[in-house]
């Protein structure tokens, strides 16, 4: 049945019917659209939310999900309960829609709560995850750094291992070389020892042969002298008080002979001795001994002249000034800074016009004493160490010095370089002195030995072992005297192997000085005293002390005046002290330019000048 307004003629064209259907649809749309206009978009929106919530609900667990799904299914059953054949009214639909809306709102609220809760948990987990990622990144960076450090350490270890291997190879090579060199050194030492033994044996044989020849010559000389004395004893000789006068009133003819090795005596002294009255046999023995010396000198002189080649003139020593009475110095005439450092030694030559000083700067300066001034003469170089002692030979042509380089050295005046080195000591040489001949010398050292030297061959002819350091030595005719650190003075016979006498003193001995008549010995020691020893009775005769006098070091030197009337020494305060030997009292003390301790003093043979040296480079000439 056609609807209202439909065409009655079935043969009407199809377009008319189409228009009619469209009009009917539009009419139904206008009448029914208003009822579902709000429901359909809300439902579509709800479906979209449901799909979104379904995605979130998949992440949630059982109970909320089951409750929501159950409610949703119940709602669907309720909705589906109205069959397709049933037609609901708009009011019922609106009621259902509101109920469904409330249910959906409840579901949405629950879902929103779950979403918020899960979102908070998710944020917490994300923050923890970020923290762990940060820690992981830091640990990864630390791991990278450790790996780099490990790689660097591995490279360094490999380099060190390579260096150790190279050093081990070098060490093994050096060890092999050292073994070879030690073997070579032992061979060389054995060869040197053999050569030294051969040399010592050869020198010992030569010395024995020389001693034998000397003994034969001495015996021959003694035989000649005894024959001459026997001939002289057969004649009658009367001694008168007038010199050079015989019994018959005629004057004896005097022959002036001056052997090279005999000292000169002044005419006044000779006459004075001959004018003394003849009182005992001692005078006769003294006269006979002098006669023997004169005869021996004549024989030696003739023998030297006979063995000389081409008639060359015999070398003679210069005349030595004889001191009749020494003058006590009163003032400083000249002051010089002679050395670069401390001055340790000073010595006058035999003619009193030449002076030698030695110091720690390894130099020996020679000075001329002219007009109360010191004029530089020469500098002797080549010393191997600090100079501790200087000495002139009896002719004044050679200088002997002790040094800290375990040796003594010999210079010839006029030559700047050392002529000979006497080596053999094992420690510092503290003293070196000529004997009464220029061809022999004696040295003392801190190695507890005293050595005698043959200067002609630079050969040690004798070594004396002592129990203490030797600080100074002096020489007599046939005796050697040494002062030691153990407060003892020892006497050695140069013709025998053993010590013949020991004199103990208080304090370490710093210096010794023998008077020119060889009858008295002056010693200086660290107990701040000077002692005079009478060698005839081997006993201490006098002890000199003074307020303010203090021995400053183990090498402080003290000396006799040439006439043995005074004793002179320098103190640590720079003053010079002079004692009268006859009275034993302090004669005077000289205060002068010395600002430091005085190390050594020297009194010239003429007795006119005194020289002192100190630790502050100064050399002072006193008059």
From Swiss-Prot:
Residues 64-79 have a biased composition (Basic and acidic residues). InterPro entries: ATG16, Autophagy-rel_prot_16_dom, G-protein_beta_WD-40_rep, WD40/YVTN_repeat-like_dom_sf, WD40_repeat_CS, WD40_repeat_dom_sf, WD40_rpt. Residues 116-229 form a coiled coil. The keyword Transport applies. GO terms for biological process: autophagosome assembly; macroautophagy; negative stranded viral RNA replication; protein transport. The keyword Transport applies. WD repeats lie at residues 338-377, 382-421, 424-458, 459-502, 504-543, 550-589, 593-623. GO terms for cellular component: Atg12-Atg5-Atg16 complex; cytosol; nucleoplasm; phagophore assembly site membrane. Disruption phenotype: ATG16L2-deficient mice are viable and born at Mendelian proportions. Deficient mice exhibit intact canonical autophagy. Keywords: Coiled coil, Cytoplasm, Protein transport, Repeat, Transport, WD repeat. It comes from the Eukaryota. Residues 64-93 are annotated as: Disordered. Although ATG16L2 is structurally similar to ATG16L1 and is likewise able to form a complex with the autophagy proteins ATG5 and ATG12, overexpression and knockdown studies suggest that ATG16L2 is not essential for canonical autophagy. Belongs to the WD repeat ATG16 family. May play a role in regulating epithelial homeostasis in an ATG16L1-dependent manner. PANTHER family: AUTOPHAGY PROTEIN 16-LIKE, PROTEIN ATG16L2. Homooligomer. Heterooligomer with ATG16L2. Interacts with ATG5. Self-oligomerizes to form a 800-kDa complex composed of ATG12-ATG5 and ATG16L2. Interacts with RAB33B. This is Protein Atg16l2. It comes from Mus musculus.
